[in-house]
A protein has these predicted regions:
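Transmembrane-helix bundle of Major Facilitator Superfamily
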Residues: 2-194, 328-330, 336-379, 383, ...
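Short, hydrophobic alpha-helical segments
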Residues: 194-195, 231, 452-456
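Interfacial helix-loop-helix linkers and transmembrane-helix boundary segments
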Residues: 80-87, 143-145, 202-208, 264-267, ...
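Membrane-interface helix caps and helix-loop-helix hairpins in membrane proteins
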Residues: 109, 173, 200-205, 230-236
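Conserved aromatic/hydrophobic "specificity hotspots" at molecular recognition or selectivity sites
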Residues: 174-214, 262, 272
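12-transmembrane solute porter fold
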Residues: 20-35, 40-42, 55, 61-65, ...
Length: 462
């Protein structure tokens, strides 16, 4: 029935009549993927105690998901273009849901980390394919509004994850931060299987560039791991330098491979386009700043103020609301105000918010400042997505979405690694100077990015 509705709409040239309902289900699915970073971070102390995890295993509980999610994102985007976004969305959602069940049952670090890797694989398949569907189903001003809804859910998801993680950890226990994905995932899977239109493959015998996927995944993994190690050991180490060099060599090899492969993962010239390049820069900065907010706020509340996980989660509720509000308002205003102006406003707002706790460190100022910063970063998610994806061809929407989502994960890794290094003195001692320095760095980074956005972001078309 739903396919008949889609076919009639396609023949008449009208938009898909179920597009907003589809967006709702896709948005909730994306929300699960974003939640799975911060919801786990709050539960880590309990997981560590129950499974007797080493410090390295605790770190990998978060980074294994981020590494796999970010490293395989381009593969997911290319698969959506070749095999159809519907097929890849459903496959990724099924893998993520099953992996969540396995991870919740984990009784050892091996099963826990294996489940996290599998969750990352499912997320890497689903996220770019879902964003590709959003771009495909909506046009013009409606697309900007849809991206606003999408970004509000994704941007607010990280803050909501802190609240949900605190509630679940304090209630039924840490396994439920994973179990909660299972019933939600199954409902969304059944709904999308019925509502999403069938799509034809891009070619009679579609192929994936597996060597290219291996190169970009390994390079991305090496780079993200370098950031993680730098947060613990410092930048001036042989291991960190070797990982950065390995990543650079891998990316060069990837570019060379894309120019010779019969079925390349992406047209490398796509990143040379000003809108795409600017959009990826903006999404990287927005995510890095967002992670800085949650990292600094979470550890400040729990280490310096001795709040528990549930109290910390409740304190982040204003941040979640502000993030979603900033994204939603920006989605409504971008068609008239333009991406450049809103990019500058969003980053300036984030800089002001970060500066508040840097000047005066107190629970009230941290909540107020991070909420202001959250509104700014929420706006940035919309501007970045609209800038990078607004002018790509339909057959490129999957890989372009993959690029945007990849830099989203890169931003999370960079933000966590750099901020944790700057704030390290406050994580192991009683001083607040590390937290102050972290907020100062975030404020300066946002201000510099605002100046860069004023120059780099394309102006409104006339």
């Amino acid at each position: 029935m739903t396919q008949d509705i889609h076919d009639k709409a396609e023949r008449s040239g009208s938009p898909h009549p179920l597009r907003w309902r589809i967006l709702g289900f896709l948005g909730v699915a994306q929300l699960m993927l974003i939640l799975d970073v911060t919801v786990v971070a709050i539960a880590l102390p309990n997981i560590e105690a129950d499974l007797d995890l080493s410090r390295q295993a605790v770190t990998w509980t978060v980074s294994a998901y981020t590494l796999t999610f970010g490293g395989l994102m381009l593969l997911g985007g290319r698969a959506a273009d070749l095999f159809g976004a519907k097929r890849i969305v459903l496959t990724g959602l099924l893998v993520f849901t099953a992996a969540s069940l396995v991870t919740g049952f984990a009784g050892s670090d091996g099963l826990l980390l294996g489940g996290r890797v599998a969750q990352g694989l499912g997320a890497a398949l689903m996220s770019p394919a879902a964003l590709s569907l959003v771009v495909h189903l909506f046009e013009g001003d409606e697309r900007n509004k849809a991206l606003g809804v999408w970004s509000a859910l994704g941007g607010g998801g990280a803050a909501l994850g802190v609240l949900l993680g605190g509630l679940l950890t304090a209630g039924p226990g840490w396994p439920w931060v994973f179990y909660v994905n299972v019933p939600i995932g199954l409902v969304i899977l059944a709904a999308l299987a019925r509502m999403l239109p069938h799509q034809k493959a891009a070619a009679p015998r579609p192929r994936l560039d597996l060597l290219g996927a291996l190169l970009v995944t390994a390079s991305s993994a090496a780079l993200i791991y370098a950031f993680i190690r730098a947060g613990d050991d410092g930048w001036l180490t042989i291991a960190t330098a070797a990982l950065v060099l390995l990543a650079a060599v891998g990316y060069v090899a990837f570019v060379a491979r894309q120019k010779t492969a019969k079925s390349p993962m992406m047209d490398v010239a796509l990143l040379a386009r000003r809108p795409v390049a600017t959009g990826t820069f903006l999404i990287l900065m927005a995510t890095a700043l967002m992670i800085a907010v949650f990292f600094l706020g979470t550890f400040y509340f729990q280490h310096a103020e001795d709040f528990n996980a549930l109290q910390t989660g409740l304190l982040f509720l204003p941040v979640a609301i502000a993030t979603m509000l900033g994204a939603n308002l920006t989605g409504r205003a971008i068609a008239t105000a333009g991406a450049r102006r809103l990019a500058v406003i969003g980053l300036t707002t984030a800089a002001v918010g970060m500066a508040v706790p840097a000047v005066s460190m107190h629970p009230a100022t941290v909540v107020a400042g991070t909420a202001i910063a959250g509104a700014g970063t929420g706006a940035m998610f919309v501007v970045a997505s609209a800038t990078a994806l607004g002018q790509v061809a339909p057959h490129e929407s999957g890989i372009a979405s993959g690029i945007v989502s990849t830099f989203h994960e890169f931003g999370a890794s960079i933000g966590a690694a750099v901020i944790s290094s700057v704030a390290a003195v406050s994580l192991v001692g009683d001083t607040l100077s590390g937290f102050t320095n972290g907020f100062v760095l975030a404020a300066v980074a946002a201000a510099v990015s605002a100046a860069a956005a004023a120059v780099l972001t394309p102006g409104r078309e006339r």
